[in-house]
């Protein structure tokens, strides 16, 4: 059974396909229209704007805080009663070095503020901080899926693995269309979305 959506789709497979197609097109627009350039790096309000932009054609909850508790495997994301306080604290975290930025990213992943689409929107948010603060972005096509997922799974306890992994994939090609497009495809691949190539939409 599919998540409730604006498209009236009942099949999970149909929804996954349309979600990938529509939100990847919106991700391309984000790059091309420079919307992010006007938004403050590292703030939850910016992540909200990214999430809303990507998913507003698909879900009513786009850009809105989740209203349910979420878990993945044995890991529980921030409980609803603490979510707003957690996000306020994340806003205040420093972000002047690579390590500080990744620590902030790890905390936002633990917060998992949305019902769906957290990983994809938060990776764009992370690159926006890296680009603004240290003049780098992650070349996600260089980050192995299994290594990334395992490092993120461990990151709440030990963040050294995700730091090493992402540091090795940093590039100063911050305005490269190719790096961005391949990065979106890879970001979606981590979540199991592989039907469409971003560059061809």
Task: List where the protein language model places each region.
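FIC/Doc superfamily catalytic core
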Residues: 1-201
């Amino acid at each position: 059974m599919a998540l409730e959506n604006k498209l009236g789709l009942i099949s999970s497979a149909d929804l996954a396909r349309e979600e990938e197609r529509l939100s990847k097109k919106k991700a391309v627009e984000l790059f091309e229209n420079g919307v992010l350039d006007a938004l403050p790096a590292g703030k939850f309000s910016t992540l909200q704007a990214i999430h809303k932009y990507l998913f507003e054609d698909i879900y009513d909850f786009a850009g809105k805080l989740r209203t349910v508790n979420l878990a993945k495997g044995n890991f529980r994301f921030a409980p609803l009663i603490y979510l707003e306080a957690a996000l306020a604290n994340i806003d205040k975290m420093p972000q002047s070095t690579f390590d500080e930025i990744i620590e902030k990213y790890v905390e936002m992943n633990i917060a998992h503020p949305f019902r769906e689409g957290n990983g994809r929107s938060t990776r764009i948010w992370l690159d926006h901080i890296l680009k603004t603060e240290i003049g780098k972005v992650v070349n996600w096509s260089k980050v192995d899926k299994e290594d990334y997922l395992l490092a993120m799974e461990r990151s709440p306890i030990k963040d050294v693995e995700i730091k090493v992994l992402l540091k090795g994939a940093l590039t100063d090609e911050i305005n490269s269309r190719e790096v961005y497009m391949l990065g979106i495809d890879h970001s979606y691949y981590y979540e199991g979305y592989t039907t469409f190539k971003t560059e061809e939409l």
